[in-house]
Amino acid sequence: MQLQRGEIQGYDFNRMVLEFTMLNQGKVILCAISTAAMDDLEGRRDVRPDQRVDQFMRLREVIEERASRKFFEEQARADRPVVLRSNDFFRTPR
């Protein structure tokens, strides 16, 4: 099962996250990804705040896939946001 694509909410400068939504059987799931995670995924550190939505668009497929996987792996609830950080993409093997 996969979450469905929702909408981009925008960049929150104070929290340094890009907020977006996903849908689980029509129910809106709030999601966010840290700017550090996007920078790590893209291998860049020079992205300005006004470029964050464009950066998200370039990385959207991998971000949404990981948000969906995290939602179901952690049996997340619709009333809690799914927040992605660098360690959600780059885990060290055990």
Segments and roles (model prediction):
Residues 8-10, 15, 29, 40, ...:
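A broad, structure-centric signal for solvent-exposed, well-ordered loop/edge residues
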Residues 19-42:
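A short, structured beta-strand/loop element
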